[in-house]
Amino acid sequence: MAVVVEEGVVLNHGGEELVDLPPGFRFHPTDEEIITCYLKEKVLNSRFTAVAMGEADLNKCEPWDLPKRAKMGEKEFYFFCQRDRKYPTGMRTNRATESGYWKATGKDKEIFKGKGCLVGMKKTLVFYRGRAPKGEKTNWVMHEYRLEGKYSYYNLPKSARDEWVVCRVFHKNNPSTTTQPMTRIPVEDFTRMDSLENIDHLLDFSSLPPLIDPSFMSQTEQPNFKPINPPTYDISSPIQPHHFNSYQSIFNHQVFGSASGSTYNNNNEMIKMEQSLVSVSQETCLSSDVNANMTTTTEVSSGPVMKQEMGMMGMVNGSKSYEDLCDLRGDLWDF
């Protein structure tokens, strides 16, 4: 019995294995190591054995019985297996067992050694209970490794045509059983909101600044503006409009913008102002055409207003002194 160490793996050529791995060590080879260190050696020498790999006939063993036949492993179990052909001259493999069958899934994966050197292929299979096509899928999965490319069987001698493969079998845990179930909270545990008391603080606007200053204007101080169309004037003098513009601004502020009074009084005061201004113009010899225009304006006015205008005209054009005229102008400006 000879014990040989090859590339860090303890191999036993015949007899029982003599090596026991210390605690903490696990047998977890890569895909390339399975092809180059184990399968190739088994194909070249059928008597080749490994400490961590046993031999099994997958057509006569159920997947849940394989862990008992394994030499090593806790979750993954490795075996050397021979393909069972359905027909002597065919390439199809018999994958049925007594209680079910192995079904290939997905695409075969290429296994390379070094830089682009194809050495093998890996096929994934899932075990189904019953018979196809109505089998029941289980969580037992198998990875089947075979030689390909450089290590293909066609490049090996005829004695190696038995087509050995390496199978890795494991039970895939269901994610729903490994994770803790979600705990449901009953509706009664939630705080009930029977009223709007919990959101009163959201409706409190006392902390917000007012949109309008309350002291700016009270209800009694609000003006009652009445739309009044100001009278039009037809004056051809280049100097007279200046005086009318000045007085018109006064009327717009004190007469038309006032909340009290009537339209009749406003028009009456306007005519008095016009007559006084015309008299001043005649005394200063600024314009000789204003009289005619003002006369026309007086004739258009109503009866009561005409009487007041004539009285005003008599007062201005009568035997009044120059001082009285100045006092009249002062009163007009004060108005």
Swiss-Prot record:
Highest rank taxon of the organism: Eukaryota
Subcellular location, principal: nucleus
Residue ranges annotated for the NAC domain, each copy included: 21-172
Keyword annotations: DNA-binding, Nucleus, Transcription, Transcription regulation
PROSITE patterns: NAC (PS51005)
Domain notes: The NAC domain includes a DNA binding domain and a dimerization domain.
The name this protein goes by in its record: NAC domain-containing protein 87
Gene that this polypeptide is encoded by: NAC087
